[in-house]
């Protein structure tokens, strides 16, 4: 996961924060920041009922926001962020993690970009399912 976050961050120049949130083993009502690349995030622990990460966790669906200023669910980690995608990662039909990517550019996450990011999350899901 660490390598994937690092490589995506390095190679995809419009990705300004790339990382994973994991279901907190101590309290599954929270997500905790996992491996990431980019600036420090003040959102190291997120309740499942808050933010775009919480929305992806509770709905089980990919969340794509092309303009975070227009979405009241957005938890600001940086005032520079303009768009975000969150892809839930399931292992044995249970939420295990999320791939979260933020961009300083509005409209970054086009349908082909989304498909690519979902395929990256799928690789992580396969890895996690064999690691458990």
Please provide the spans of the model-predicted regions.
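Short hydrophobic/aromatic beta-strand element in the GNAT-like acyltransferase core
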Residues: 17, 86, 98
